[in-house]
């Protein structure tokens, strides 16, 4: 794998709330990561302006708002995300088949024959969760089995891929095929701590398992030199 290919796999989690920080990180890292993730805190604080600033700095965007509501509401919200020109956006697989399918039909209808729509991802089981977490909400399945079940449901609904722990990537590949996108948080390079993630893997391990994109935040943001940290992660991926 080339360095350019490795860079494209990294999604920097822009976990900030100040608009000035958006421009800072976008300008600093736009040549060193493939995409920027805008989550709930930043989007609530700054709205679409955060997305536009990243785009102005030449960056691509994963709008990570994890929609989960009645089908029409999620479909319309996802359409608005798509109209912002983001590359990735997501919803919860636990919202069910109808919610996911309605969303994909709405996007395909509105983007038919024109600009390519963003890829839509379904959240499976959050990387901060484990089997005890699932039991607490009445789910008795082991985490890997639940992840695969949700991934297969998402694929059947027309969703482009999933967000899942790197530990489940190989299982998802077996169940859903090589063209189904897999985005993995819970990735920690050799120089970083696990923080609040429970199901983690190194960048090289996650890519080897078949991950298309790696979501990485604190190991880069908290480093003395964020650019050097990003470059080290690229080194790890290339070295395999």
From Swiss-Prot:
GO terms for cellular component: cytosol. It catalyses: orotidine 5'-phosphate + H(+) = UMP + CO2. PROSITE patterns: OMPDECASE (PS00156). Substrate binds at residues 15, 37, 64-73, 127, 188, 197, 217-218. InterPro entries: Aldolase_TIM (IPR013785), OMPdecase (IPR014732), OMPdecase_AS (IPR018089), OMPdecase_bac (IPR047596), OMPdeCOase_dom (IPR001754), RibuloseP-bd_barrel (IPR011060). GO terms for molecular function: orotidine-5'-phosphate decarboxylase activity. Gene3D superfamilies: Aldolase class I. The active site is at 66 (proton donor). The keyword Ribonucleoprotein does not apply. Its EC number is 4.1.1.23. Keywords: Decarboxylase, Lyase, Pyrimidine biosynthesis. Disulfide bonds: none annotated. GO terms for biological process: 'de novo' pyrimidine nucleobase biosynthetic process; 'de novo' UMP biosynthetic process. The keyword rRNA processing does not apply. Pathway: Pyrimidine metabolism; UMP biosynthesis via de novo pathway; UMP from orotate: step 2/2. Homodimer. Belongs to the OMP decarboxylase family. Type 1 subfamily. Catalyzes the decarboxylation of orotidine 5'-monophosphate (OMP) to uridine 5'-monophosphate (UMP). This is Orotidine 5'-phosphate decarboxylase. It comes from Citrifermentans bemidjiense (strain ATCC BAA-1014 / DSM 16622 / JCM 12645 / Bem) (Geobacter bemidjiensis).
């Amino acid at each position: 794998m080339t360095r350019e290919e490795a860079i494209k796999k990294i999604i920097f989690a822009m976990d900030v709330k100040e608009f000035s920080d958006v421009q800072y990180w976008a300008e600093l890292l736009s040549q060193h990561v493939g995409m920027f993730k805008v989550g709930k805190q930043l989007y609530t604080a700054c709205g679409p302006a955060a997305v536009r600033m990243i785009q102005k700095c030449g960056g691509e965007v994963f709008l990570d708002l994890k929609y989960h509501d009645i089908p029409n509401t999620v479909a319309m919200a996802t359409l608005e995300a798509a109209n912002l020109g983001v590359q990735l956006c997501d919803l919860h697989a636990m919202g069910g088949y109808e919610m996911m399918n309605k969303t994909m039909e709405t996007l395909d209808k509105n983007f038919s024959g024109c600009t390519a729509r963003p890829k839509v991802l379904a959240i499976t089981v959050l990387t901060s969760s484990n089997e005890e977490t699932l039991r607490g909400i009445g789910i008795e399945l082991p985490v890997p089995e639940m992840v695969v079940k949700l991934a297969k449901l998402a694929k059947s609904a027309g969703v482009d891929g999933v967000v899942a722990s790197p530990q489940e990537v190989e299982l998802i590949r077996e169940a859903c095929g090589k063209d189904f996108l897999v985005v993995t948080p819970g990735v920690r390079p050799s120089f970083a701590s696990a923080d609040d993630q429970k199901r983690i893997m190194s960048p090289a391990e996650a890519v080897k398992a078949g991950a298309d994109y790696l979501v990485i935040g604190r190991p880069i943001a908290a480093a003395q030199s964020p650019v050097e940290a990003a470059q080290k992660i690229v080194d790890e991926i290339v070295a395999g």
